[in-house]
Amino acid sequence: MQGLIDCGKYKVTEVLSSHSGFEAALCSDVTVNDGTVYIVNEYSSMVYIRELLQLFCAMEKQRFRGFRGLITSNGSFSAVFVYRSGVPFAEYFAERSGDYDTNLGLADSLLRGELEFDLIDDRTAACGLTCENAVVNAAEGQVYFNMLLDPDRTAGENFRTKRLGGMLRMMFRTDRYFPDEIAEYIEKMCSGGFRSCTAAYSAWREIQPSAQKTREAYLKESLMKYLGRRLRGSIKKRRRRHGA
């Protein structure tokens, strides 16, 4: 973090990750002292500098939410982002069975908040849009991504929506009252059925009225009616698998 020391603006409070040519740390701005915490990603490998500096410059022009700018130093550069407090995403949903309506709101926050990832390049999006970077702020009803950007992270085709689909799977308990519309939507997300976060969020909003009606109907149905519905669903899936 020599660049931070040289600029005299940030103080390192905790190192989060470090390997050859890369270091990420939590920092405070000593010139303001307003309590805001930042994640600073420093790249000192010439390979990383050549590959990434232009991408971060483009991100800065896009005014990516939470991006506070670049710090350049002799032999390195750093990208500074606002840090969001919260419970790590996987930990939050592992410890809570979850209220459906609460999780529905968090899912909307997740999908709405990640529209900006469509605006940036695949390399930096692959580093930032990960379950490990996500936190849940239950008091605000929001899901945030803290931009710890390890340059060695990679991703395949349609990784944005596939990763979000995997996170949605973690959020919901698919019991007898779970709407088919949302279950099918998550499956489509995980299989790469959406080309962008924007397309995925648009589809999400479109299914909400019918999903709400379906859930209301399922909450009222008898056990026998549910068992019949489940049997019909199993037969339909079997036929699809066999191409009937």
Predicted regions and their residues:
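ATP-binding glycine-rich loop module of kinase domains
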Residues: 1-66, 93
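Activation segment of protein kinase catalytic domains, centered on the conserved DFG
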Residues: 93-109
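Short C-lobe core helix of eukaryotic-like protein kinase catalytic domains
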Residues: 108-122
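Short beta-strand micro-motifs within the conserved protein kinase catalytic domain, predominantly
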Residues: 66-78
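Structural motif in protein kinase domains
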Residues: 84-94
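Short acidic, S/G/P-rich loop/turn micro-motifs used as interaction or catalytic elements
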Residues: 43-47, 86-87, 150-153, 173-174
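C-lobe/activation-segment region of protein kinase-like
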Residues: 121-239
